[in-house]
Structure formats: C-alpha cells, structure tokens
C-alpha cells in the first residue's frame, strides 16, 4: 500500500486472503515495474551487458492452502514461483501454482523486461539464462530475432547423449 500510494483498508486475515486473490493484474505489473525501475536507477551508467537469470523454484506448502498441487519433480505440494534476478537484484517474483508448465509466463516476462530495459539502455547486451525446464524453441527463436543472447540447459535426448558419450570417450577418459 505504501509503495503504491494506495489506501486500502484491511480488517482481518480473511480480508487479506480475498485481497491477495483479487489483486488486478495491472497492480501486479506496477509492483514488478517498481523492482525493475529500482534496478535501473541503481546504475550510474548503462551496463555493457546484463544477464537475466530465470529460475522457477518450489515453495513447499503445509496444510490445506488454496491452489496447492502435488509436483512430481519436487515430490511435494508446493507453489512454483518464477524468480528473475540480475546479479544481486530481484527483478520479478511471480507466484504460480505448481500444476503448470514451468516455462509458462517466461516468454511474456522476458519480453516485458527487455522492452523496459531497452527504453533506458538501448545498447546494453541482454543475456537470458535458464535451466532446461525453461528451454522452448519458439522463445529461443524470439531471442535471436530480438538480439537477445541466451544460455539455457538442454533437456537430455539421444543426439546429446551420443555426443556426450563421444566426448567422454575421446577427450575425458585417460588412456
């Protein structure tokens, strides 16, 4: 409330719960924009390069919380928030249920971040970094079309496994 200069009366935990579940999407964007603008304003000069780290992470839930789902990878009931950082700066913290594709919202958030950063620093190199769970072909094509470099993990597949075995055999195993 203080951050956005909005006066909303809160009476009880149930009111808080209703408030959290009914926040307009625009308000969430305003909150995230404050984080990004604070990051931008913390620089005296445009950086030569920025690496945006995208990381979905599990937040284990206890009890009967709204929106709780079991996630097979984490083997627990959890939320799956998407965190975006650049160096030590938090740029985005997006709470999501765990019954979705971990890459959901990544492309949209990356696009909004790139647009905002380039408004202030049009010549700064932007690098998208994420693990294999966020690697999507169309998004990487978008990165290339928009001059965004990327460092992403690739999910295992037969071609990578064959190449990996070749390199292990010929370059990493002592003879």
What do these predicted regions represent?
Residues 1-34, 84-91, 110, 118-119, ...:
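Short, positively charged, Gly/Tyr-enriched micro-motifs
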Residues 8-9, 13-82:
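Active-site-proximal, Lys/Arg-enriched surface segment
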Residues 57-59, 89, 97-98, 155-157:
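Short, glycine-/Ser/Thr-/acidic-enriched flexible segments
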Residues 100-159:
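Domain-level cores of phosphate- or acyl-group-handling catalytic modules
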Residues 149-175:
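An anionic, glycine-rich sequence signature occurring as long contiguous blocks
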């Amino acid at each position: 409330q203080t951050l956005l200069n909005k006066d909303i009366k809160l009476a009880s935990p149930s009111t808080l719960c209703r408030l959290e579940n009914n926040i307009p999407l625009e308000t969430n964007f305003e909150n995230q924009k404050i984080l990004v603008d604070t990051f931008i304003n913390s620089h005296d000069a445009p950086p030569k390069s920025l690496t945006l780290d995208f990381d979905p992470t599990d937040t284990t839930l206890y009890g009967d919380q709204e929106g709780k789902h079991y996630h097979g990878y984490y083997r627990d009931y959890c939320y799956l928030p998407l965190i975006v950082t650049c160096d030590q700066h938090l740029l985005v913290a997006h709470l999501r249920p765990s019954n979705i594709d971990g890459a959901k919202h990544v492309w949209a958030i990356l696009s909004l971040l790139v647009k905002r950063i380039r408004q202030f620093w049009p010549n700064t190199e932007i690098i998208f970094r994420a693990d294999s769970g966020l690697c999507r072909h169309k998004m990487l094509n978008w990165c290339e079309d928009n001059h965004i470099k990327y460092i992403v993990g690739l999910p295992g597949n037969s071609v990578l496994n064959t190449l990996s075995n070749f390199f292990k055999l010929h370059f990493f195993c002592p003879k």
